[in-house]
């Protein structure tokens, strides 16, 4: 015999075959309903406000956290925009400084080049003047020496001693002029004869 058959047999022997097991007695139903009502009233009176308060606090914390997060995000976005603006400004400033430096560098190079050209021109001018002065001095010295040598030679060749300084100077000038003319290629003729002095 199975267990379910044994239970059915015990139930039928109890003698309460008229009663429905699913419908409780009225007294139990009233007491159960009253207890449930008290439990619901206690829940709405004590527990529900605490739950609502906790729920409100949690909602407030969540919304406050969201608001703080949004504020922090806005602040971060503003800082990012400010950083980008400063970075753009710094790049523009760096480009301007670089361009100014290039311009200044070119100006300095041009100034140095112009200054060097002026110095070169001045040095060349001084050198030319010095060369001209040295040449004039050397030419004068050579003329004197050549004149003395020419007079000595003329005196030895002619056998006549030129005593006068004016005559010596005229003879030297004539001789040097003749040498200059032949050196310049004025002609291929022989130098003019030196005049006899008296």
Curated annotation (Swiss-Prot):
Main localization, broad class: membrane
Membrane-spanning residues: 25-45
Keywords (A to Z) from UniProt: ATP synthesis, Cell membrane, CF(0), Hydrogen ion transport, Ion transport, Membrane, Transmembrane, Transmembrane helix, Transport
Localisation: Cell membrane
Disulfide partners: none
Molecular function terms, GO-annotated: proton-transporting ATP synthase activity, rotational mechanism; proton-transporting ATPase activity, rotational mechanism
GO cellular component terms, semicolon-separated: plasma membrane; proton-transporting ATP synthase complex
Sequence similarity: Belongs to the ATPase B chain family.
Name of the protein in its database record: ATP synthase subunit b
Organism: Frankia alni (strain DSM 45986 / CECT 9034 / ACN14a)
